[in-house]
């Protein structure tokens, strides 16, 4: 396998003359609520009329698998989640102490989504210029959602958005 210059090999071919394919990788659509996903799909479909959508979707799995994926043994996701507090401190001048918060990932079956939370490990107060907020031990801050889909539910969403469902794998 040698290196190739794919752009150079295209020889200045005109881009945009044919049908468009929109690629939305990973399972990023899961970061939208179902209502937001519907709007996105409608807009994406309109943007590539005559073309195609290639979308990564995370499907519903057993709860243990989903929760383990969002609470990995190495603590990568927990560190990512707690890092929000450092950014809030920097941007808003708060005094969140990262060590005072535990990462929690739970699957809400009724909403078909993983919810990530930060949970206060003890009673504490967070301060900022002109204010403060007390948190009781165990109180949570809901930081992120990741919606999961069954194939029939996602196909129904596509239909609702006016998108013809194609191949799934």
Each predicted region: which residue ranges?
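Substrate-binding/catalytic lobe of Class I Rossmann-like enzymes that use SAM or dcSAM, i.e.
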Residues: 59, 65-164
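A short, conserved alpha-helix within the catalytic core of class I
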Residues: 31-43, 48-49
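S-adenosyl-L-methionine
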Residues: 1-12, 16
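Single, function-defining residue in the core of a domain
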Residues: 167-169
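Conserved beta-strand signature within the Rossmann-like core of class I S-adenosyl-L-methionine
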Residues: 46-62
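Short SAM/SAH-binding signature in class I
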Residues: 18-27
């Amino acid at each position: 396998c040698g290196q190739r210059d794919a752009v150079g090999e295209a020889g200045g071919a005109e881009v945009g003359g044919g049908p468009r394919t929109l690629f939305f990788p990973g399972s990023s659509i899961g970061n939208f609520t179902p209502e937001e996903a519907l709007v996105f799909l409608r807009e994406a479909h309109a943007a590539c009329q005559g073309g195609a959508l290639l979308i990564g979707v995370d499907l519903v799995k057993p709860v243990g698998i989903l929760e383990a994926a969002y609470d990995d043994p190495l603590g990568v996701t927990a560190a990512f989640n707690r890092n929000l507090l450092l950014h809030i401190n920097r941007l808003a001048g708060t005094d969140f102490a990262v060590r005072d918060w535990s990462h929690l990932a739970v699957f809400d079956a009724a909403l078909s989504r993983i919810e990530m939370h930060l949970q206060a490990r003890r009673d504490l107060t967070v301060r900022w210029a002109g204010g403060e907020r007390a948190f009781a031990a165990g109180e949570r801050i809901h930081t992120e959602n990741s919606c999961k889909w069954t194939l029939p539910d996602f196909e129904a969403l596509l239909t609702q958005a006016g998108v013809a469902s194609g191949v799934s794998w």
